[in-house]
Amino acid sequence: MRNVAKAGLVILGLAAMSASSLAATSNFVRPVANTLRAAEFGKTLPPIGYVDFCGRGEDECKFHGGKIEAQNVTSETWGQIEQVNKYVNTKIRPATDMELYHVADYWTYPVDAGDCEDYALLKKRYLQGLGFSADVLLMTVVLDENNEGHAVLTISTNKGDYVLDNRRREILRWDETGYTFLKRQSQIQANQWVSLQPVQPQASTIQIPVGTKSK
């Protein structure tokens, strides 16, 4: 993922742990099958990459939402979601932040290449351009099947939370992805994040490297 910094945000005492070591020391809760929406467990720290991104003054970080809890899905809106997911996955070439920017984590809107969080940011921008509310388009951090940090875009709908993923053509409901969901943007304010895991002693201070591998 890319780095995002909101002016005025100060993060102290962050633990530098790899995703694999984090998974080994914490009992994360995986999605329960047939659960339409991911449960939220209070505020948590945003990814450092996102904090840096916001610190560059990106409009993505400024919305104050909470007006719409879920997108009403019709055949038309679902078609738009599928088109955006396919277009971005096809247009953008996968590349790590280290390859592109010579840093471990850097969030930005990609032009022709990017890491997982860049795909998600661009999909969010395109969907907002089609009239979708930012309230339901949520940047999300997960652990993948290899317990590595990964970023996706969650869209909250009346049919459940669905995931737009640069690694997959199919748009799956969150509980069908095989991922462990850690945290995502708040629907109330973009630069606030909420935990998707029950409160744990170190949950609010751990930062997880995201997107060390693009594919």
Residues covered by each model-derived region:
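Generic extreme N-terminus detector
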Residues: 5, 18-21
